[in-house]
Amino acid sequence: MIDFQNVSFSYGEESSGGGIRNVNLTINTGEFVLLTGESGCGKTTITRLVNGLVPHYYEGNLEGDVLLDGKSVSDTPLYDLAAMVGSVFQNPKSQFFNVDTDSELAFACENLGYPQEDILKRIDRTVSDYHIEDLMGRSVFALSGGEKQKIACASSSVLLPGIMVLDEPSSNLDMAAIDDLRQVLSLWKKQGKTILIAEHRLYYLHDLADRVLYVKDGEIEREYTPAEFDSLSDGTRKEMGLRPFSLSKLKPANQYQAHTAKQMEFQNFCFAYKKREPESLHIPSAELPVGETIAIIGLNGAGKSTLARCICGLEKKCGLLQVDGKTLDWKARLKHCYMVMQDTSHQLFTESVTDEVLLSIDNEDETVVDKILKQFDLLEYKDRHPLSLSGGQKPVSYTHLTL
């Protein structure tokens, strides 16, 4: 059982932005609880309080107590918590400690000094339960996003923890990989594990969650049964900043047509990361309208990121690209293109959001910076370290800063 007893937490001296206030919450053994809410509302902090990253790793001001089966998280060493709570994060790469899948599955057991025979038995059982025989003996760098998340789920459960905590595990996955993730969650639920998951993408959790908790400004504002949550009107859901609980409720956005005859043309747009390897990108010819919003879709590993890197000039030798008849080499594309990466932590360089803005503009007047931040609802975070922003706030802030 997980028990929050009047818990408040803020990062450093910050009183807002990802912290929580006066949270009282009991999650019973075997219960599946979904945390949802807008980016920066405090969902991730709640998960960190359960797996012990707060306060053992992330420092701040903590009041109240979190109990796991009667044991205080604050008083329990992380190595003991690791056997009690399994964690799966938004970016599985952030929790890998080894370069191959076999070693990754063995790592937690080895770290706690389990006998070799026991480790091998646990790995064999985990591989069988998760149907990942084809992923064993592989480099983690050669796995697709969905395959990495499978290994993350498997490695986090080798110790047989009774509690599983997940923080937006589907954010980088395609439909097929999300379906695989749902099957893992279903397995955990059948095994009687207590599951706490923070998510924006909700449809795949339909019929799995026992309770839905809506978090706003660091507080659990509302609690729903799945039926109550599913019955929310579109207007109410949009006011709450939430996605639909069912794909059948998705509606197309308003159509927009750019009034321009300009075209972006691709000729022999091909790329391979290494010589003698199959091409990751092969576009003999294509035309796209300039001035429109275009979605590049496809399965994990299909070449979407490679295409974006080539368009932006991050890869040099990839064929011909013309805009309105003018050829743009890779240097010209670097000047005219901006790219927001999957993990925007790689693109944030300074000690504060204010300094990050100053990197992007010629004017060093902080009043100009404040005006920009206010325009995009980022002013309250001006003195925060960019890497301390939530997973949803980082790409939003970087996108606005590049503009």
Kindly label every feature range from the protein language model.
Residues 1-4, 9-22, 54-59, 77, ...:
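A short, flexible loop at the N-terminus of ABC-type nucleotide-binding domains that lies
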Residues 51, 312:
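Helix-to-loop junction immediately C-terminal to a conserved catalytic motif
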Residues 59-71, 319-333:
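Conserved ABC transporter NBD signature motif
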Residues 117-135, 366-381:
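Conserved ABC ATPase "signature" region
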Residues 139-143, 147, 385-389, 393:
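Conserved ABC ATPase signature
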Residues 164-167:
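Catalytic Walker B motif of ABC-type/P-loop ATPase nucleotide-binding domains
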Residues 199-200:
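H-loop/switch region of ABC-family ATPase nucleotide-binding domains
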